[in-house]
């Protein structure tokens, strides 16, 4: 088993944090993303770790070489990182991909070691790691059946939020057997890139393969293990909370936010002062029913609002200020 890490991107949405370094060099809790990932992978007795690098690659390679991990690291340099996407980076690693079973992951992830163990301990050869869809997630989503078959790939722009209970999110960590890579994935990857170009995503190739044969890959579902994808400074801020060094530090970071805890779906807040009777169910139903109109139309002026308030509270308009 080997690992391939895609780390060529520029991470523009992180602004100044990636001005002189690639995205995987940003820190969460004082530890760089790539450092955390490599130390986890180094424990798994892998034959090698292949990194496809591009933007600010000299800084990245120098840093990785200085970590002193035991697993050999091979580098592939994507010189055209600024005008290609991850399908091109992965195609550059195809000769490694067909050699042996592979853990494929993207470098902008922060995750628990348990995620890697889930894939390694599962006897199934080709797996996509997935998590139940939550409101903070974006990007490609999946529909998974009771046998863990991936029955649909849904691009982020086509998500129907009314159907979100059916969705799973790709974590962007995969286990690919050498046989699957050699006989299925790489041939499709090459053909897809020839037709569609190199500014595409490798997930599109997986979607195409599964449209033809849903048995080539299964979904491996997470069960509460922590992970986060770092695309912008808000992601980074949330990851600082999720991956705080200990419970005390996590508590400090959470309480300093003074709300907005819906961004942490599994958090139970026992301190926030709320009125449990408001809003009543009837009011919520009416708001939902009129939501489209409320969003699209502009409100009445002050005179009409004073009139409505006077009617609601049973007082004269002159007493509304």
Model-assigned labels for residue ranges:
Residues 1-3, 167-266:
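Conserved alpha/beta core of the MobA/IspD/sugar-nucleotide pyrophosphorylase nucleotidyltransferase superfamily
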Residues 1-60, 310:
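N-terminal glycine-rich phosphate-binding loop and ensuing alpha1 helix
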Residues 6, 105, 270:
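Catalytic metal- and UDP-sugar-binding loop of GT-A-like glycosyltransferases, i.e.
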Residues 55-74:
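Acidic donor-binding segment of Leloir-type glycosyltransferases
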Residues 68-146:
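Conserved beta-loop-beta/alpha segment of the NTase-like Rossmann-fold superfamily
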Residues 112-196:
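Conserved core of the sugar-phosphate nucleotidyltransferase
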Residues 241-297:
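N-terminal "arm"/small-domain region of PLP-dependent enzymes with the aminotransferase-like
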Residues 299, 309-321:
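Short loop-beta-helix segment that forms the pyridoxal 5′-phosphate
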């Amino acid at each position: 088993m080997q690992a391939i890490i895609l780390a060529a991107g520029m991470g523009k949405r992180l602004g100044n944090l990636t001005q002189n370094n690639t995205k995987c060099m940003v820190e969460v809790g004082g530890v760089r993303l790539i450092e955390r990932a490599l130390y986890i992978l180094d424990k798994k007795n892998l034959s090698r770790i292949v990194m496809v690098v591009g933007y600010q690659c000299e800084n990245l390679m120098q840093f990785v070489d200085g970590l002193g991990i035991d697993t050999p690291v091979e580098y592939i340099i994507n010189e055209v990182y600024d005008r290609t996407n991850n399908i091109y980076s992965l195609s550059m690693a195809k000769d490694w991909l067909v050699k042996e079973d592979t853990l494929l992951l993207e470098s902008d992830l922060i995750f628990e070691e348990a995620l890697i163990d889930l894939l390694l301990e599962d006897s199934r050869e080709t797996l996509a790691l997935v998590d139940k869809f939550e409101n903070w997630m974006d990007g490609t989503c999946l529909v998974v059946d009771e046998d863990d078959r991936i029955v649909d790939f849904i691009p982020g722009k086509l998500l129907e939020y009314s159907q979100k209970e059916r969705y799973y999110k790709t974590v962007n960590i995969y286990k690919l057997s050498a046989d699957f890579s050699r006989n299925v994935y790489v041939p499709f990857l090459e053909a897809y890139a020839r037709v569609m170009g190199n500014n595409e995503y490798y997930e599109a190739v997986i979607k195409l393969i599964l449209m033809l044969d849903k048995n080539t890959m299964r979904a491996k579902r997470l069960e509460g293990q922590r992970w986060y994808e770092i695309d912008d400074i808000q992601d980074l801020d949330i990851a600082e909370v999720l991956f705080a060094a200990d419970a005390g530090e996590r508590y400090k970071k959470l309480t300093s936010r003074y709300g907005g805890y819906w961004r942490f779906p599994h958090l139970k807040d026992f301190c926030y002062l709320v009125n449990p009777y408001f809003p009543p169910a009837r009011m919520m139903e009416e708001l939902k029913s009129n939501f489209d109109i409320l969003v699209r139309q502009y409100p009445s002026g002050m005179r009409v609002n004073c009139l409505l308030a006077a009617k609601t509270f049973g007082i004269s308009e002159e007493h509304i200020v």
